[in-house]
Regions:
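HDAC/HDAC-like amidohydrolase catalytic core signature
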Residues: 1-337
Length: 337
């Protein structure tokens, strides 16, 4: 199943934000799937066209602090958005932001982000019923308990899992994070939670690992809190990426299969990605396909329900990564119908 709701907008330009996240990532992928000679005529078998889930303040409070959630629902919201999306630099100047070009108030961005969280929750529910689901949007893995970071205001991954746990739909889960950047927020939020196991394969250097690991008081930088399984990939190690990932996945086997796996299928490791901070990892389209097929079969062969979210992907070519995997996965799933 694929969740594609036309009301979910990915782009940021309406808010005057110049980060290269585009509506076209989901739209171009969907249009090509709709026109596919095999998948197009069977669209009613794989498309969910409406996000019907709702996410409440209570859902956020299972993951984020009362103080932080309170700021998101107050007149402090705009300040939190500016900080999370890094719209003002150290000198107090606008950075990747021109409010004069905005057609929507900045605070409406929070509503859009909550809609993404709802999509992630719905994707997880459908994965439990249908074994596989892919949702456009989601994967906000940098948000931590008390603050947002790296364009992520709330951590939809952990919000979704804790919501399903509260409803007794799942007990255990894996988070397999394929984004170019380390899933630091998810690692921090789940480090004392044995019910959620995290794996992150990411750039060994660069944001969010570009600071000091410890502050002057000897406290660990939250971005350096380890996932249960971390797979750092160094500059020039692209040829080792798939083998490193396979070795990391095999470590999960000894833990025992979870009730659900969430996969952050980031397209930002792509060599054509346009966000400067992804430049330490440049995978080809073929390498990304090998990545995605490896993870898919690893989970499917163990009978683990799998919910996919898009996570990072920047610029005009991000959709290419999504399309090649979704086309392949849908054709695989339609074999059973």
């Amino acid at each position: 199943m694929i969740i594609y709701d036309k009301n979910l907008k990915e782009g940021l330009s309406e808010f005057g934000i110049e980060i290269p996240i585009h509506h076209s990532r989901a739209a171009r992928t969907f249009e090509k799937l709709k026109d596919h000679e095999i998948l197009g005529p069977k669209i009613d078998q794989w498309l969910v066209s409406r996000i019907s889930e709702t996410v409440t303040r209570k859902d956020l409070l299972r993951v984020h602090s009362d103080e932080y959630v309170g700021r998101l629902y107050s007149d402090k919201l705009e300040d939190e958005i500016i900080r999370t999306f890094e719209l003002i630099d150290e000198k107090g100047h606008y950075y990747r932001y021109n409010p004069h070009n905005a057609t929507l108030p900045l605070t409406q961005l929070f509503e859009r982000l909550l809609f993404k969280v709802a999509g992630t929750v719905q994707c997880c529910r459908l994965a439990l019923k249908k074994e596989f689901c892919f949702a456009f949007g989601g994967g906000m893995h940098h948000a931590k308990r008390d603050y947002g970071a790296g364009f992520c205001m709330v951590n939809d991954i952990v919000v979704a899992l804790r919501k399903l746990q509260a409803e007794n739909l799942i007990r255990t889960a894996w988070v397999i994070d394929l984004d170019a950047h380390k899933g630091d927020g998810t690692a921090v939020l789940t480090r004392e939670d044995s019910s959620i196991t995290t794996l992150s394969i990411h750039m060994a250097r660069g944001w969010p690992l570009d600071g000091e690991a410890y502050d002057q008081q000897g406290r660990l930088n939250p971005s350096f809190v380890p996932s249960d399984i971390d797979i750092p990939v160094g500059t020039g190690e692209e040829h080792l990426y798939v083998a490193k990932l396979q070795a990391g996945l095999e470590k999960l086997i000894g833990i025992g299969p979870p009730d659900l796996a969430i996969v952050l299928a980031g397209s930002d490791p792509y060599e054509k990605d346009e966000l400067p901070s992804t430049g330490e990892l440049r995978l080809s389209l073929q390498q990304l396909k090998e990545r995605d097929i490896l993870v898919y079969h690893f989970l499917k062969d163990q009978g683990i329900p799998r919910a996919y979210v898009t996570a990072g992907g920047y610029g005009e070519h991000a959709w290419e990564v999504d399309y090649q995997f979704i086309e392949w996965a849908l054709l695989d799933n339609l074999k059973k119908i």
